[in-house]
Amino acid sequence: ESAGKGKKKTALIVGIIIAVLVVALVAGFGVWWFILRDSDTQSAQTQSTSQQSGKTKSGDSKAAKDDKPCTAAPDAELGSVDHSDANLVAQLQLTSNCASTKDGDTAEFKESDVKVSIKDDEGNVIASAVFDFSKQPVKFNGETANVALEFTTRQYWRPYDQIETGSAEVILQTGQSGTGEAGSADGDALAGSDIDSEDAERYAQLALSWQLKHDESAASRFYTTYTTQLSSKKNGMKADGKTWHYVDIYEQFLQQRIKHKNAILIWSGDYPTYTKADASTAYYVILSGDTVDSVKAGDAWCKSNGYGAADCAVVDLQ
């Protein structure tokens, strides 16, 4: 009987121990689950906060990007050309290459030191100068804008009415250096400073060659009739108190052509009237292109246009 009571007592103790262990395990699991859930919640909250913070930064970054100054040069097309006295006025149609601002507007283009060059369909540079758009920022209507640029007679190398606008190419380059000061332009046009003198000389020399070829047919009619000669110059020639270079020679041609719409350029070595006196003659000659019936009529033309005997002579090309 004592042995039976001992077994019952032992079983009771074991049961109590097992119950305590079960309670401890349940309590431990509850604590572990609570801690894990809290950790996951905090992690999710942290991740959500991080994502929200990332969106804010992205939005701020975009706004900051949109509000940056427009430094990319716009694309350009040549709309039309005209003249102001002897200067060339080019109307350009610009298309912005910059993003819109956060207000939905296209950022203004107001870079300084922007070289604008116009080329013909053969790739010849026929106008080039450096403009400061900070003085007259380009304001876009949507993504486009129209601007007027004025080129002096030392900045363009093609008579304004011989420029083919439909086939011309316009190139804008930022970060370029000009020489001298920009002059004043008429109306709303913006004036620019000169490009490098060596580049200008090269463009002027090419322009003289182009002009000679272009004017050949117009010159041919003066084999049989008279016209008036207004200038004869060569590169390196000393006259009128200065040394003449290609830019000077072409500038004089442009100025004379504004005064006399029929003015043409010829090469003295191509025509008998000059080679008879000097077989090695090599001058760029400006003719008024106006027809006169006689030497006397030509002299009268010179006088009526304000030229003295040293500046105007009656010639034919035979």
Regions found by a protein language model. Name each.
Residues 1, 5, 10-318:
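Acidic/polar low-complexity segments and flexible, solvent-exposed patches
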